[in-house]
Amino acid sequence: MCGIVAALGVVASASAAAQGIARPVADDARDGRPFAVVDKRAATLSVYAADGTLLGRTPALLGLTPGDAETPGSRGKAPETLTVQERTTPAGRFEAQPGLNLHGERIVWIDYGASLAIHRLRPAPARERRAERLTSANPQDHRITLGCVVVDPAFFERVVLPSLGSGVGGLVYILPEREPILASAGGTPRAAAP
């Protein structure tokens, strides 16, 4: 438990919001699975081994529209049909599972039914400047995706796939940016896949 608490001290330094997640993550970490924390305020993804050891932290691209809840009516829609208001990265606790996208690329499903995943940076229209946004120090510049958590390809291959993208998956906590942190962190986990 001490290793978990020590590792979570690193999460707490990411933003003030991350401090409130320490107890739920420490409790869940006892189940032997790796876990990740998406800090939307800081636009980062932190990945931990099952024992609480920090495996890595990286900047992340997030949903274009700020918000903590999935937009009603957006579940099950084709990603390209989502409106600007539906392009959120919802807060919560999720049971993540390794999987493939429609192009056969390895991803980590956060919520399969909502087409929400962690994946590597892929080619996109030049006007979106995704690679530039990913390196920006301003977290607001990181708002561009349909809702997925997008990270540098090297980090995805080196940290995400070996931990969350193999075996039984893990837990992903997406911290709220507007709601109190414990309201979104607790409760029943949401399944990544049907």
Regions found by a protein language model. Name each.
Residues 1-4:
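Bacterial N-terminal signal peptides that target proteins for export
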Residues 11-14:
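N-terminal signal peptide c-region/cleavage motif recognized by signal peptidases
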Residues 20-129:
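Gly/Pro-biased beta-strand-loop elements
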Residues 87-194:
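Exported/periplasmic cell-wall-interacting domains
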